[in-house]
UniProtKB/Swiss-Prot annotation:
Record organism: Carboxydothermus hydrogenoformans (strain ATCC BAA-161 / DSM 6008 / Z-2901)
Function text: Catalyzes the attachment of isoleucine to tRNA(Ile). As IleRS can inadvertently accommodate and process structurally similar amino acids such as valine, to avoid such errors it has two additional distinct tRNA(Ile)-dependent editing activities. One activity is designated as 'pretransfer' editing and involves the hydrolysis of activated Val-AMP. The other activity is designated 'posttransfer' editing and involves deacylation of mischarged Val-tRNA(Ile).
Protein name: Isoleucine--tRNA ligase
Subcellular location per the Swiss-Prot or TrEMBL entry: Cytoplasm
Cellular component terms per the entry's GO annotation: cytosol
Positions annotated to bind L-isoleucyl-5'-AMP: 556
Family of this protein: Belongs to the class-I aminoacyl-tRNA synthetase family. IleS type 1 subfamily.
Superkingdom of this protein's organism: Bacteria
Motif 'HIGH' region: chain residues: 57-67
Reactions catalysed, as given in the entry: tRNA(Ile) + L-isoleucine + ATP = L-isoleucyl-tRNA(Ile) + AMP + diphosphate
Binding site for ATP: 600
UniProt keyword terms in alphabetical order: Aminoacyl-tRNA synthetase, ATP-binding, Cytoplasm, Ligase, Metal-binding, Nucleotide-binding, Protein biosynthesis, Zinc
């Protein structure tokens, strides 16, 4: 007889293989068809709000793994919150202005921005930005990210730009916006000023030179045939030198050498000798403050260079005397203000010397470096020259070195609201906690924010100039006129209309009454664009009615402490007096298995679009959940293979659960808790411990804890223990026996909870499995369910402690069975008869459960003997003996029994199976 047909073997259409690349798009189409985002919003209406405000990625190119990490983290949080009692809308956004998009538009569309009108150029940039916002939108959706994709925000939207103008106006009204001549980071390639957040540091090779300045007024301290020696790595800034700075507290030495007398810091004399190959002795010493007022002559320009005092001078390198050019450095500029020094910056927007540099006019900076050092060598003023490699600021877009250049720019004065910003930082929850110190120090130490850019693709600085008196005009009236116009026509209107057409009829200059005006030509820094998003998106309910201010959470990479978190904090504190976020979470960056950064040259870049095609989006989502995002995250094809293996184990567990519920109706067949078998109650306790741990981890944003807890539950508690033990009961017992229904009751609870717990991570797989789940009154999507709740009555500590001991016994038996298998004594564990030898409490414990052990060990027979056994090294005092099982093998359940063959109708079965077969035979078909 074919007994296979009499067993309750698993039945499910849920496939073993995920085949995610083919299956996921069909699920996506289903979500779109039912308008899942709106359904979730309707379900959660009236619940407390949780607003995760999306930091806008650049609408520039296809998505990369950094995007995946960021967007999936956000999606997991939003999905969890919407299943944990919150109304958690998610409005995605894009940053659409600025240099990156200008450069790509120029390159991809083959245009020259200097040969077409600003409006034409802006139209091309808009076309490029909108195209990539559309492309990225589809790519983010393909990742399973749920959001209001039909109503996202783009920083180029007219209503967004209008709100940004209002923010600028509020800051100006409070006196935080000013125009000033200051040294700013300047990219000669991109021809624009840059903010600190647009700077990257990279290694650069620079000349390292020692230059002498002849003393012309020694103040009775320094002989007038002596020289002061400076050290610099930027010879090109020497034409702008107007002073030499010394530290007031340092001791300086007059050193007599074979080539003249030189003044350097006493602590750097030896270093000076080594660099210049000079020898000599110290003949005099003086404090830095005594040198104030000493005057030197510039080595190649007819100009004096006096000594000034500055606390930032160090003894780390050089000579302790600092070449000071207020037009080329922030500290130099502050010193220049203190001593009323001229601000010279004889370098134009392309990094070419102007007439102010004398004979070097027309040269590029690098050529100037060479020419200046050659001239210094010819005049004998170059004492030493070498080359060094050092960390130097580079432009974030074109990757070229930047310069400091004094130009007239628009600034936001941080001093006006710095103290309030620091107070607000203290109120925000920073995740990880070190983020607080990082942004606190940045805000405490940062200079004023340069907000003007000499480009075209962006929001204009809404300032007018009076043609009569030349003064800047920024009033409530002018700001409102610009904001109202932009709300209707967008910022293109600034280039479309003359100043007089933008300003209200009859507008007059508030300074002189003039009636003719011109517009500012600079645009705003893109960090001002995205930094205004808290107001432009969260405070415009007519466009995004689900949102509110402030946000509960901002979540970006840790580089945004000086970027978006900082600019958002600045605009919010300046205009509203408080931070725009209650909590800020940061993640690390991507590295390969060896800890190296992703780069095309190393060939270690993982393309997410390729991974989705080959493995599926759920594998990427699981990778994000499995890694601890608080530090740098490793990604490689090998790591993704390991992730896919982890996925397979979770999927197999889900499939087993589904397969064994094919004939189960929870309403009809559910066994009350009190009547569940002990092992089933243990599994339920394990499940509810898991629920408690996972929900807590989600609330703490510890997704790697979620993954490892669920993975461990599936592979250890379930596959290796519980599911293995109950297979016999599920397959062999009568289909509707209470023993089998007891197991099924718990399998149903486990599956129901697992699908909910995994939905924020494995969005596609849980949706697919939910379709196969035999529940009554199912929702349209698993995402419309809530998180499972912990049932305290299932957390039976006494039961769990008992089972810890049972599993300790089982572990020792499994080891013995494995040895017996290796020795060819048995094949399958059911071939075994196990003898347990113990005494005392353990013997009593074993005897109490004598009928349970064969099921627990998955063996045919177990007997227990009372013998003294000592447990070595804290081991269980238990001896396990494995022998070949007694009797014949039952052809239905494969257990051995001396009673096989007693039933004449089913002579090759054990009494248990014979009883089941008789019962089945007597049932109507």
């Amino acid at each position: 007889m074919d007994y296979g047909k009499t067993l309750n073997l698993p039945v499910t259409d849920f496939p073993m293989r995920g085949n995610l690349p083919e299956r996921e798009p069909e699920i996506l189409a289903y979500w779109q068809k039912i308008d899942l985002y709106r359904k979730v919003q309707q379900k959660n209406e009236g619940r407390p709000k949780f607003i995760l405000h999306d930091g806008p990625p650049y609408a520039n190119g296809d998505i990369h793994m950094g995007h995946v990490l960021n967007k999936v983290l956000k999606d997991m949080i939003v999905k969890f919150k919407s299943m944990d009692g919150y109304d958690a809308p998610y409005v995605p956004g894009w940053d659409t202005h600025g240099l990156p998009i200008e450069q790509r538009a120029i390159k991809d569309l083959g245009i020259n921005r200097k040969e077409i009108s600003p409006l034409e150029f802006r139209a091309k940039c808009r076309e490029y930005a909108e195209k990539y916002a559309r492309i990225q939108k589809e790519q983010f959706k393909r990742l399973g990210v749920r959001g209001d994709w039909e109503n996202p925000y783009l920083t180029l939207m007219p209503h967004y730009e209008a709100k940004q103008i209002e923010i600028f106006g509020e800051m100006a009204k409070k006196g935080y916006i000013y125009k000033g001549l200051k040294p700013v980071y300047w990219c000669p390639v991109c021809e624009t000023a840059l903010a600190e957040a647009e700077i990257e540091y990279a290694e650069k090779k620079s000349p390292s030179i020692y230059v002498r300045f002849k003393v012309v007024e020694g103040k009775g301290k320094v002989p007038e045939d002596a020289y002061l020696v400076i050290w610099t790595t930027t010879p090109w800034t020497l034409p702008a030198n107007v002073a030499i700075a010394v530290h007031p507290e340092f001791t300086y030495a007059l050193v007599k050498t074979e080539k003249g007398d030189y003044v350097v810091a006493e602590g750097l004399v030896q270093q000076f000798f080594e660099a210049t190959k000079l020898t000599g002795e110290i003949v005099a010493r003086f404090k830095g403050e005594e040198l104030l007022g000493v005057v030197t002559r510039h080595p190649f320009i007819e100009r004096e260079s006096p000594v000034v005092l500055a606390d930032y001078v160090t003894l780390e390198s050089g000579t302790g005397l600092v070449h000071t050019a207020p037009g080329h450095g922030t500290e130099d500029f502050e010193t220049g203000k203190k001593y009323n020094l001229p601000v010279l910056s004889p370098v134009n927007h392309q990094g070419v010397f102007t007439e102010g540099a004398g004979k070097y006019a027309g040269m590029k900076i690098d050529d100037g470096n060479k020419a200046i050092t050659q001239d210094l060598e010819a005049s004998g003023d170059l004492l030493a020259m070498s080359f060094i490699k050092h960390s130097y600021p580079h432009c974030w877009r074109c990757k070229n070195p930047v310069i400091f250049r004094a130009t007239e720019q628009w600034f936001a004065s941080i001093d006006g609201f710095r103290e309030q910003a620091l107070k607000e930082i203290e109120k925000v929850e920073w995740i990880p906690a070190w983020g607080k110190d990082r942004i606190y120090n940045m805000v405490r130490d940062r200079g004023d924010w340069c907000i003007s850019r000499q480009r075209t693709w962006g929001v204009p600085i809404p300032i007018f100039y009076c043609e009569a008196c030349g003064k800047e005009i920024i009033t409530d009236e002018s700001i409102k006129a610009v904001s109202d116009l932009f709300r209707v026509e967008g910022s293109d209107a600034w280039w479309k209309y003359e100043a007089g057409e933008i300003l209200p009829d009859g507008f007059r200059c508030p300074h002189c009454g003039g009636v003719k005006f011109r517009k500012e030509t600079d645009i705003m820094d893109v960090w001002f664009d995205s930094g205004s998003s808290h107001a432009a998106v969260l405070e415009q309910p007519e466009y995004w009615p689900d949102l509110r201010w402030p946000a509960d959470l901002y979540l970006e990479g840790s580089d945004q402490h000086r970027g978006w978190f900082n600019s958002s904090l600045s605009t919010a504190v300046a205009t509203r007096g408080m931070a725009p976020y209650k909590a800020v979470l940061t993640h690390g960056f991507l590295v390969d298995e060896k800890g190296r950064k992703m780069s095309k040259s190393l060939g270690n870049v993982v393309d997410p679009l390729k991974v989705i095609k080959e493995l599926g989006a759920d594998i990427l989502r699981l990778w994000v959940a499995s890694a601890d995002y608080r530090s740098d995250l490793a990604i490689s094809n090998n790591i993704l293979k390991q992730t896919a293996e982890g996925y397979r184990k979770i999927r197999n567990t889900i499939r087993f659960l589904l397969g064994n519920l094919y004939d189960y109706d929870h309403e009809k067949h559910r066994v009350p808790y009190e009547r569940l078998l002990e092992i089933d109650r243990w599994a339920l306790a394990k499940l509810h411990r898991l629920i408690a741990r996972v929900v807590r981890a989600y609330r703490d944003y510890e997704f790697h804890v979620v993954f490892h807890a669920v993975h461990n539950f599936c592979t250890v508690d379930m596959s290796a223990i519980y599911l293995d033990i109950i297979k016999d009961r599920l397959y062999v017992e009568l289909p509707d026996s209470e023993k089998r229904r007891s197991a099924q009751t718990v399998l149903y609870e486990i599956l129901d909870s697992l699908l909910r717990l995994l939905t924020p991570i494995l969005a596609f797989t849980t949706e697919e499995a939910y379709r196969h789940f035999p529940a009554k009154g199912k929702k349209e999507s698993v995402q419309l369910l809530d998180m499972p709740k912990v049932e305290e009555r299932y957390l039976d500590l006494t039961l769990e402690e008992t089972w810890d001991k049972i599993l300790e016994v089982r572990a020792k038996v499994l080891k013995a069975l494995e040895i017996a298998r290796q020795e060819k004594l048995i094949g399958h564990s059911l071939d075994a008869w196990v003898t347990l030898k113990a005494s005392g409490e353990l013997y009593d414990f074993l005897v109490e459960r004598v009928n349970m052990w064969p099921e627990i060990f998955i063996v045919s027979q177990v007997d227990i003997q009372n013998e003294e056994v000592t447990g070595e090294n804290g081991e269980l005092p238990l001896e396990v003996v494995v022998n070949k099982a007694l009797g014949e093998k039952c052809q239905r359940c494969w257990m051995y029994s001396p009673e096989v063959g007693l039933d004449p109708e089913f002579p090759d079965t054990c009494p248990r199976c014979a009883g089941v077969l008789h019962e089945l035979k007597n049932r109507p078909l």
